[in-house]
């Protein structure tokens, strides 16, 4: 009886350890995503700093990355507004030479008005208009699921090392963005693709035939009727003009 009791205790402990091991693996292990040429790009924002016209300025930085070739594009703005979001997409598409079939995003306020159950979203009307203009599909990650767009999450960290630590003082934001665009293209030629024995530029050359034409930039303006005050002032976004 004592022998059987010890065997039962051992069996229970072994099963417990196996369950903990299995649950731990399922909780922290993720299957890498594979992408076809022209299938997808990923987008995200970050905050970084640069010296512009002798002043250290905090910038909102748009990051775009093709999921197949890993060609990345970075552009800086003063704010994360719709107009700047639209501008970032157009410049990235132009640099890549076309548009993939879908874009992968988190639930940023300029794209999603309300996060619902599962993958259901109330998509912002202006963002939806941009997506319709460029003819790609928008896909949104689950909340707090950064691994679903892991490439662009990594690109934010890589950009700080490859770009922002080396950026010289600039006379203007336009000059900074010109420098960033040129540096991104140079890095495509210099950097090896993470899973293939070739450069990012070589992978992009193979991907470009699968991209849709960019066409005309999306005109994202919104017309609003405003009341002029007796002193000839109007209020827009809590600022008087």
What are these regions (language model features)?
Residues 156-241:
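Active-site-proximal acidic segments at structured loop/helix or strand boundaries
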Residues 5, 9, 13-72, 81-84, ...:
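Mobile-element integrase/transposase regions
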Residues 105-106, 117-118, 136-160, 176, ...:
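RNase H-like two-metal-ion nuclease catalytic core shared by retroviral integrases
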Residues 74-102:
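Active-site beta-loop-alpha junctions of metal-dependent nucleic acid enzymes
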Residues 119-138:
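Two-metal-ion acidic nuclease core segments, chiefly of the RNase H-like superfamily
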């Amino acid at each position: 009886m004592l022998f059987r009791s010890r065997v039962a205790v051992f069996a229970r402990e072994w099963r417990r350890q196996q369950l903990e091991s299995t649950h731990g693996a399922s909780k922290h292990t993720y299957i890498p995503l594979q992408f076809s040429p022209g299938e997808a790009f990923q987008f995200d924002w970050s905050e970084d700093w640069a010296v512009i016209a002798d002043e250290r300025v905090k910038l909102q930085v748009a990051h775009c990355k093709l999921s197949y070739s890993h060609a990345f594009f970075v552009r800086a703005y003063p704010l994360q507004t719709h107009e700047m979001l639209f501008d970032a997409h157009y410049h990235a598409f132009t640099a890549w030479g076309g548009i993939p079939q879908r874009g992968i995003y988190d639930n940023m306020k300029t794209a999603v008005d309300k996060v619902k159950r599962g993958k259901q979203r109330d998509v912002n009307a202006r963002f939806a208009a941009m997506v319709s203009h460029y003819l790609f599909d928008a896909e949104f990650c689950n909340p707090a699921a950064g691994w679903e767009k892991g490439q662009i999450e990594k690109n934010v960290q890589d950009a700080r090392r490859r770009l922002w630590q080396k950026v010289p003082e600039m006379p203007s934001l336009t000059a900074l963005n010109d420098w960033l665009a040129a540096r991104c293209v140079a890095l495509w030629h210099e950097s090896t693709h993470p899973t293939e024995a070739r450069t990012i530029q070589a992978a992009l050359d193979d991907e470009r035939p699968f991209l849709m034409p960019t066409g005309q930039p999306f005109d994202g303006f919104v017309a609003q009727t405003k009341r002029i005050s007796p002193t000839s002032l109007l209020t827009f976004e809590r600022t008087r003009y």
